[in-house]
Amino acid sequence: EPIGRALELEGYALSDAEQRQMLDFIRARRQEGYPVTYGCSHFLGLTYEREVRDWYFLCNAGIYTASIMANGDIGACLDIERRPETIQGNIFRDDFKQVWTERFEIFRTSLAEQSKKCAECAQQRYCEGGSYHSWDYDRKEQRICFCNP
C-alpha cells in the first residue's frame, strides 16, 4: 500500500503484476479451502473482490469509523494522511458527538465524484472511488485502482 512513508519508497511497493499474483495466490488458497482473506484495503474490482474476501469492500472511514490520534485529533481512520481537511476536530477541545454529526463531510461524499477517471468507470457504483487512505488528496485520484488500471 503506498501510504505514509511507503510513498517515499517506491522500490518496495508491489507492482501491479505482483499485486495480481498475490491476489491469484489468495484466490487459489481459498478455493483449496484455506481460511485466508485479503484485508481491509481497497476495492479490488469485480474480478477479485468476492474471490479473495468474504464480502465486497467499501471504505467505512467517516461513515462507521472514527479515530482519535494520540494528540487528540479526530479523524476517520488512522491510516489516512494527516492533512487539515482530514482532521475533523480535537477531542481535547471539541465535543465528539458534535464532530461526528456535523463534520466528516469529506468522508461522506463519494471519492468517485472527485475524480474524472472514477466518475467514468463502469465499476464506480461498487467502488465509490476506493479507499480514503490510498487517495491522493492533491491530484484527486486513487493511488491504487484495480477497476480501471
Task: Please tell me what each predicted stretch does.
Residues E1-G75, D79-Q88:
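Radical SAM enzyme [4Fe-4S]-AdoMet core and its adjacent flexible, acidic
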Residues D79-P149:
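Flexible mid-to-C-terminal extensions adjoining Fe-S/redox cofactors in radical SAM and related proteins
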